[in-house]
Amino acid sequence: MTLKHLNIFVATMTGTALMVAEDISDFCNDNGVNTNVLEMDNLEINELIKSKSPVLVTSSTYGQGDVPDNGQKFYNAINKNSPNLSHIEYSVFGLGDMTYRDTFAYGGKKFDKLLSSLKAKKIAEPFYHDASDGSLPEEVAVKWFQKNVLKFI
């Protein structure tokens, strides 16, 4: 039996995207999927390029619609090197706040646009959580993951 595996790449400023990633990881582990939760400040581009497992990006948004500081180097390296990612399957769970409508969840949206432009295969439509709606992002994320992503891993 082949073990299922998922890499979760995290870009966060305050830790919310990491909390989301850890809750998804716990859900996966309870459902027969091994995970690696990797914060982007510890990632090199080759870890994405060489990935044989699906990738889930969890990213908050910072400033004026920016990728969080700990994800900037990784994002910029992917953007600069423009590797062919046609072998990568991915999805995105982005975090934002509709109070900032013009830049809502841009951290996650930027990763989605970049990965898609490099031919990565989207296995599920991204979800963008709105902090202003009062829901807990980790609960929303696990439900979204269970319904939309798990079946593709």
Where are each of the predicted segments found?
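Local sequence-structure signature of Cys/Sec-based thiol-disulfide redox active-site neighborhoods
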Residues: 6-10
